């Protein structure tokens, strides 16, 4: 049901602005919580709550457009994509602060009678939701086809510049698209709450991603395709849960998405012209160059980080330092992918998870030495992540970034469902501590020193690559893909290579995490980890490896040292991303060229 509503909502905004609105699912979730408040706490009738939620959600959508999309309308769409991702984080955690994180029963304002329809029995809320979906989609189709404002929306979606020259108020049309999509999303949240029976602030946030997948499967640019894609995704989800259980739900949803990308990138009902080129991050987020440090700067930094922190800070500061170092190891090679080649990965938690479980299993099951398992973890993560994503590098547009996000969900689904190997949701426990040359590293100070050595190696390798011929080729691919192709280069192959390098170091970081915390479960490797890594890279400057270290220190070290609550921490991450992309897109450790 929700994919059928969310798909057209995402489609309307994507068509008009060229932006994948990741905040759409959060608007659905916020609408569900508002509906719970109005009906369950305030005692309003359901129809009045429906109107109030529709108006409130429309207002939220207008604010999101005003603060995160409209100011970046002339920037590459990847910038607005990241800010809507950040807006989703802000809205989810604001909802958690306002309504608390508890799961609660959703009020049932409609009768619970079963209605026989063609041999299928539907509850009253099911029938109302189905009727609303059909009516809303028909009304949306008619409005877009025959309405004056609907025609303006279609004209703006086809060519904003031409629409502006014809006198169409493009800014007002973009506002209207956000108001409409957010209104439908909020109302869909109420029906989601009625259907689910129990909700929490995070219950429906996933629907924004599923909505884009439904629209992409059906075909971007086609209302019929978006609805059909929603039905296909909903059917696959139901069949997957019925046959294999809920653990494999995401595998079917995102597996179908990847399959459609490979076989028919423009979707079941879409046309090829809707698959647009990926904007180059180097012209916006990557503007400027990072400052160069003298050799004595590096010596001083090594002394402070390697000696002062463990000696003066003790185990507490060393524990914080291990987390900073691990996230920095993941983020530093991302500067090759996002900074040099101009490709953003939204699922970097996937190779981290692969490396963590691979290293833990190699040591626990095969009794391999830790250092061997550490290197093999990076190799396994790079090979598996690259093999799964290799075909997608021939695609363009938002699809590549979304495919990396899909990989993250697929890996998590496999981990949850492969009980015989990964122990599923129970996780792996008793993972041995790192052991090097017979010396077992048990205390935080030792872990920190080990992580610092791996981080130093990572920085050395990435700096060497950036200053080499390979680094120049990667930068050329990111600067102008068409020109690099005309010179005989293979841009997609080099993008895949940059992704493999980032996955290798991410796998090693996962191995360090596994052996230092002695326990793994799927909740460690959520999309929030991927977003945090991307935030670190953007904050430091996507062309600056050392900036990634500073970003990790700011976004991981400071919140840990200040002991901020998780919801406040993620709220802070979202605000930082929006502020950096809007006001300092080149990052902190970058000077203007």
Please name every model-derived segment.
Residues 82, 89-118, 242-249, 265-278, ...:
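Extracellular/periplasmic helix-loop junction at the C-terminal end of a transmembrane helix
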